[in-house]
A protein has these predicted regions:
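Active-site region of the double-stranded beta-helix
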Residues: 1-101, 121-125, 129-182
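Histidine-centered metal-chelating micro-motifs
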Residues: 104-117
Length: 182
């Protein structure tokens, strides 16, 4: 359902903390995602009348490292019908409000695990080292779900593709577009 990857301490000097992620701990990195939340940022936010919806990636494992602030993370396994709660800071991880890992660590959950996050009052910054499987598809990777954690039943309430930016150039002069296309 999840695992922790403690960072290896490489150096501690006055004013400097230097840690590393051992490369063998993440066999494949397909994407490196920088995620910045403002104060009390909620991800995903309220949607379709659901106050606290969920994400679930069909084809992506998440390897989350909090760099600044704190993240309140809930994950849910539909197979085990089990939910876990974490508070993740740059230096510690708490599970169910108890200290669980007293050092910098990355939390990992595989594809198929539901998750949702709230950032603390100072906001937060994280890096996610994503591992993408053959089922990865950006058009559904950020679908938003309504999930019943008692029964495990869920449904898509927002197509994640609707929130993806459109990077295409917008031609102001349609005559120019016609010339370019000829």
């Amino acid at each position: 359902m999840y695992r922790l990857i403690p960072l290896r301490q490489l150096r501690r000097t006055a004013g400097v903390v230097f840690d590393e992620i051992v490369p063998s701990d993440i066999p494949v990195i397909n994407g490196i995602d920088r995620v910045i939340h403002k104060a009390n940022g909620i991800s995903p936010g309220p949607c379709a009348g659901v106050a606290r919806p969920w994400y679930m990636h069909i084809g992506q494992d998440d390897n989350l490292l909090v760099m600044r602030g704190e993240r309140f993370v809930e994950i849910y396994c539909p197979i085990q019908k089990k939910k876990e709660s974490f508070i993740i800071t740059p230096d510690k991880i708490y599970k169910n409000d108890k200290l669980y890992c007293d050092q910098a660590a990355m939390i990992v959950w595989p594809a198929g695990i539901f998750h949702r996050i709230i950032s603390g009052s100072d906001g937060s910054i994280s890096v996610n080292f994503s591992t993408r499987t053959k089922e990865f598809d950006l058009s559904n990777n950020f679908n938003i779900f309504d999930l019943n954690t008692e029964t495990g039943e869920y449904k898509v309430i927002r197509n994640g593709a609707l929130d993806q930016p459109d990077f295409s150039y917008k031609y102001k002069d349609l005559n120019l577009l016609k010339i370019l296309q000829s």
